[in-house]
Amino acid sequence: MSEILNPQDAELEEVILGACLIEREAMPMVADRLRPEMFYFEKNALIYAALQAMYRDGRQIDIITVKNELGARGKLDAAGGP
């Protein structure tokens, strides 16, 4: 019996994260539709969880603030490091 794998596309996950970082209208479109556990790759899930929390708290989202958020959560290394 073969193992069932979840669909995965690293490039698509990275495009979503990139859009959330650079396009102001992206987070409102995905925040209520995507959950961190929908990302196959753990580092992408960690980054998205930080983005989602920051969006819900009304905080500014950019590469520096997300890096700081991941650091505050103790997840910076797991998300790809500094």
Enumerate the language-model features and the residues they cover.
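Noncatalytic partner-interaction/assembly domains of nucleic-acid and motor enzyme complexes
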Residues: 1-82
